[in-house]
């Protein structure tokens, strides 16, 4: 196994946390979908520049998309939009502690989805490590929020809890789907496959969320433009996080990547 995915995943997790921290500053200035839009629209130009550097600067061939790739990208893009919206929505609840804690079950869901969709099962040893790490992350998260086991079970019926579980599912699904997209290109350069997948994904996401905002939330585009400085910072941090995630997904199982990324 190529262990390059380990430092790449650590970088992805760092910049994802940075992006999320920056994105919270937009919460009071934009709607939930407006803040979601920023992540994709302002990351896309950076994704295009990076792909151009790889293709033109290093003389690498541009991947040739196929129908399977298109299907993976569409599914991955939509699930990631849903995840981002749900995560931002979750922070608007005063009692989101249980929800954010249970969203950490994402890695277990990734392992299951990867086995179903990509026919890639983790080894028994890795499965044990994933379960132990997930329990550890849940315990740490619950301790941070001062949650008891009983409190978590009592909160299972709350809307914020269900949103948290849904966050874990859609984040896990997008990870698996984007791995499927990059691998379906069958390209010699994993870096180029990851970069090409990210360009197409963020473009599609930008188009879809733009249509939503223009149709249902008129005025949000203007608000985004008014906050372009912080939006551009969010987009840059988000691009680095995304290209690191996508690259790691091409190097090894998404379950391993998400387990380390927690």
Tell me what each language-model feature is.
Residues 47, 112-115, 124-145:
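Hydrophobic transmembrane alpha-helices of multi-pass small-molecule transport proteins
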Residues 87-128:
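Membrane-interface helix-loop-helix junctions at boundaries between adjacent transmembrane segments
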Residues 110-114, 118, 178, 182, ...:
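Small-residue (Gly/Pro/Ala) motifs that create kinks and tight helix-helix packing interfaces
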Residues 170-174:
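Conserved extracellular-gate-facing transmembrane-helix segments in secondary transporters
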């Amino acid at each position: 196994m190529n262990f390059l995915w380990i430092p790449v995943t650590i970088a992805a997790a760092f910049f994802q946390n940075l992006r999320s921290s920056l994105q919270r500053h937009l919460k009071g200035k934009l709607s939930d979908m407006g803040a979601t839009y920023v992540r994709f629209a302002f990351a896309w130009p950076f994704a295009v520049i990076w792909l151009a550097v790889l293709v033109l600067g290093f003389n690498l061939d541009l991947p040739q998309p196929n129908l399977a790739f298109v299907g993976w990208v569409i599914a991955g893009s939509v699930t990631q939009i849903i995840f981002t919206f749900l995560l931002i929505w979750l922070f608007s609840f005063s009692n989101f502690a249980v929800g954010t804690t249970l969203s950490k079950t994402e890695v277990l869901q990734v392992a299951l989805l990867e086995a179903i969709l990509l026919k890639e099962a983790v080894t028994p040893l890795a499965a044990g490590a994933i379960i132990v790490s997930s329990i550890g992350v849940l315990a740490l998260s619950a301790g941070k929020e001062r949650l008891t086991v009983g409190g978590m079970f009592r909160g299972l019926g709350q809307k914020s809890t269900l949103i948290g579980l849904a966050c874990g599912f859609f984040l896990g699904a997008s990870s698996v789907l984007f791995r499927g997209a990059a691998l379906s290109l069958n390209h010699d350069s994993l870096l180029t496959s990851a970069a090409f997948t990210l360009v197409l994904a963020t473009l599609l996401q930008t188009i879809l969320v733009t249509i939503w905002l223009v149709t249902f939330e008129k005025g949000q585009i203007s608000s985004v433009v008014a906050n372009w400085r912080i939006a551009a910072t969010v987009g840059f941090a988000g691009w680095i996080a995304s290209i690191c995630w996508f690259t790691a997904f091409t190097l090894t199982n998404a379950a391993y990547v998400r387990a380390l990324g927690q």
